[in-house]
Amino acid sequence: MGKVLLATDSYYYSPTANGICVEAIADQLVAMGKEVHVLCFRHKNDLKEEQINGIKVHRIEMDWVNKLRFLYEKELTGMEQSFVKNIMIFLNRLEAVFFIHWFPMRSPIFCARYKRKMEQLQNKYSFDIIVASYSPFEAAYALTYMDERIPVKKCLYTLDSFTNLKKRFFMSREYQERKGWKWERKIYSKCDIILNLKCHEKHYNKTRYDVFRTKMKIVDIPHMKEYDFEENLEKEKTLTIMYAGAIRDDIMPYALTYFEEMMQNDRLVFKLYTRSTVASYRKMINKDANKNFITNGFVDRKTVLVEERKADFLLSMGNANSDFISSKVIELIATGKSIIHIYSYNKDSALPYYDIYPNCCCLNINDSVDINKKKIIEFINSERKTVPFKELEKMYFLNSPKYTAQIISDLEGTF
């Protein structure tokens, strides 16, 4: 039985999108008979170590920026949330200035601590394979700089890209590209295998990556997963559409415009689960529609998954000028339910996934409002069928956790 360590940021109780991907792979590796460990960030009240679903979880104390980020995202509301968020943004940008030469590294001390913990676990458990997700940067750094005398296969799981980025802060795309490429060369040279997401495939087809080509494999967001809940999934009497996640300010007003008349006539309830401020959106619709606009703050992932399966329709918001594919897209498709996808960018990265999904209505906000309203009414009035999971698993086989887990497992036999 092979031993695998997966290194990530926040896992299970307060997961990031990357932590959720790692969880799906970890669960699949356990199902394949592997001994699986996870190294992740420690949140308040978390144990330093515990067993979760057959996986040994080891936690490391976070740096201050991450502590503040998760504090305002998960625990605070109102003025307190805004205050802590502003402090976090200030410290984050201050670190970016201090360590701009080493972008995207922000905290050398945290990197060293993550590396030390990874080495300690390797010396204790003798893993066959270590899989470090990027992000966090600390996991990729630790994988690269851990003691080379340690016999272990190294896998970089690039859930985010070092180089295929949008402009951030005060740095130009060219600067980010140059610094990211420098880190890629360092990290890739130390890895036995590099897993790149399909949404970045075109980027990694550049000739400069030819030297690493034999190490690279294309995978995808591993969210094509079936869930079995014991909770009562009894549906509401009124049709419901549900959205969970960050709100795009350029898309949300259009969504409300499209749904307002049906909400006003009690034909549709719009449920929203988000950390984003929603007060301004209530002012965009009339009083009669507002009663069917149900807003909620942050809730745990299990609640979101249950609510998605109770809803009649799921709302998806597109990406803005980015190759990156949100894990939420695959999560919604995996339900087999009716999806309304609203986007603004003609090359929206989610469209190739929704184009082959037989239960989706895609709306470009640049089209006529009346035409889009008509499309929605026709879609809502049409016969609703849930696409069987077995059918979806075949259509989106790259998105199955089995696909990525098998590539990692195969690495064990290359010693």
PLM region spans:
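Active-site proximal beta-strand in glycosyltransferases
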Residues: V4, I129, Y145-L165
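Membrane-proximal helix-turn-helix segments that form the acceptor-binding/catalytic region
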Residues: A24, E138, Y145, F162, ...
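Conserved nucleotide-sugar donor-binding subdomain of glycosyltransferases
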Residues: G78-I129, Q176, G180
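Short beta-strand->alpha-helix junction loop in the catalytic core
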Residues: F162, H200, I218-D228
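A short, active-site helix/loop in glycosyltransferases that binds the activated sugar's phosphate group
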Residues: K186-M216
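Conserved catalytic-core segment of nucleotide-activated headgroup transferases in glycan assembly
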Residues: M224-Y227, E234-M284
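Nucleotide-activated donor-binding/catalytic signature segment of Leloir-type glycosyltransferases, i.e.
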Residues: S280-T303
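Catalytic binding pocket for nucleotide-activated donors in carbohydrate/polymer assembly enzymes
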Residues: R309-K394
